[in-house]
Amino acid sequence: MIRLAIFSLCTLALAACQTEQRQARPQTPSFYASMAQSGAVVDAAMARDMIGAYRRNNGLGPLTIDPDLQALAEAEAQAMASTDRPSSADAVKSRLSSAGFAAPAANLSAGYHTLAEAFSGWRESPQHNRVLLDRSATRIGIATVYTPNSKYKVYWALVVAADKR
């Protein structure tokens, strides 16, 4: 009986000393984060890294996030959302050229809910893939806008360019 009491006391003492171990929930990588929700912001650094790795695998140089291109991408994504349709890349390229960027290019699309989906779709489209693998590109900007009442839900603007002239 005494052994049982001592064993029980020791067990209780050890249990009291044990710290609670929290099991960390695995965090979803940002390229799988849904942009189809209010307040969602695409991870520009992750986009740069994904596209940069793809470019590196194809013998091309890295990209740098450019604040001016980022602002232009945000404005373009917002413009598409306000008209509820994707824009023409030619108009965006013209604006980028007017802003002093050399060799501008753009991927404008709608309907992808995650960066992973957009990146996959762009790689599968010859026209969009050319933008990802543009040899002269050194700078990048990317943005999304969520529009809950749109058939597309999410508008994407990816812009790349060479350094400013």
Where are these regions (language model features)?
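Disulfide-stabilized extracellular recognition modules
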Residues: 115-165
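N-terminal secretory signal peptides
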Residues: 39-75, 79
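Short, surface-exposed glycine/acidic/tryptophan-bearing loops
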Residues: 70-115
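Secreted/periplasmic proteins
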Residues: 33, 46-49, 99, 105-112, ...
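Acidic/histidine-rich, surface-exposed loop or edge segments in extracytoplasmic proteins
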Residues: 27-37, 50-59, 102-103
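Surface-exposed patches in mature extracellular/periplasmic domains of secreted proteins
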Residues: 57-71, 84-94, 129-145
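Sec-dependent bacterial lipoprotein signal peptides
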Residues: 1-15
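Bacterial Sec signal peptide processing site at the extreme N-terminus
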Residues: 11-37
